[in-house]
């Protein structure tokens, strides 16, 4: 069973996001070993760009050379669920690399993180709250894993 890692900035504050993420994490866990790191939001008194830099340093401190960094960014590559499933298959084929998905806090990701990413993935051209992006990513990864296994979850 291949492993997927997640590095998130901030806890899920809304119960409906916590419930949805728990739901898809449980389902995705049937197909992959999951490792989740939740980093604290930067101190509230910092200006937004300082928060982004602070969180970026915390993210990069968690990334190992064997991690294949995939960051979510509204300017990243958009793909269909089927395309994501094909990428997921490739990303998990190399036992020496661990796909590591990163979502920043409310103000986004530091350039340092984006520049280190092998893949920049976009869920939409629209700006999404990071809690919604986390939920959507987990659902789409579950859908991608289901597609790869021929599960009826994805209706074509």
UniProtKB/Swiss-Prot annotation:
It is found in: Cytoplasm. Its EC number is 2.1.1.177. It comes from the Bacteria. Signal peptide: none annotated. S-adenosyl-L-methionine binds at residues 72, 104, 123-128. Keywords: Cytoplasm, Methyltransferase, rRNA processing, S-adenosyl-L-methionine, Transferase. GO terms for molecular function: rRNA (pseudouridine-N3-)-methyltransferase activity. One of its GO terms (cellular component) is cytoplasm. It holds the Pfam family SPOUT_MTase. InterPro entries: Alpha/beta_knot_MTases, RlmH-like, tRNA_m1G_MTases_N. Its main location: cytoplasm. The keyword Plastid does not apply. It catalyses: pseudouridine(1915) in 23S rRNA + S-adenosyl-L-methionine = N(3)-methylpseudouridine(1915) in 23S rRNA + S-adenosyl-L-homocysteine + H(+). Specifically methylates the pseudouridine at position 1915 (m3Psi1915) in 23S rRNA. Homodimer. Belongs to the RNA methyltransferase RlmH family. This is Ribosomal RNA large subunit methyltransferase H. It comes from Maridesulfovibrio salexigens (strain ATCC 14822 / DSM 2638 / NCIMB 8403 / VKM B-1763) (Desulfovibrio salexigens). The lineage of its organism: Bacteria, Pseudomonadati, Thermodesulfobacteriota, Desulfovibrionia, Desulfovibrionales. The gene is rlmH.
């Amino acid at each position: 069973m291949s492993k997927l890692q997640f590095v998130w900035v901030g806890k899920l504050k809304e119960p409906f996001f916590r419930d949805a993420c728990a739901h898809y994490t449980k389902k995705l866990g049937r197909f992959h070993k999951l490792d989740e790191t939740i980093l604290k939001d930067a101190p509230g008194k910092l200006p937004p760009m300082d928060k982004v830099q602070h969180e970026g340093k915390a993210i990069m401190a968690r990334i190992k050379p064997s991690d294949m960094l995939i960051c979510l960014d509204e300017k990243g590559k958009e793909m269909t669920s089927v395309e994501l499933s094909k990428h997921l298959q490739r990303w998990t084929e190399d036992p020496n690399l661990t796909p590591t998905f990163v979502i920043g806090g409310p103000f986004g990701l530091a350039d340092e993180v984006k520049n280190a990413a092998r893949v920049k993935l976009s869920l939409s051209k629209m700006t999404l709250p990071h809690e919604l992006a986390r939920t959507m990513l987990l659902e789409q990864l579950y859908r991608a894993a289901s597609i790869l296994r021929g599960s009826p979850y994805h209706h074509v």
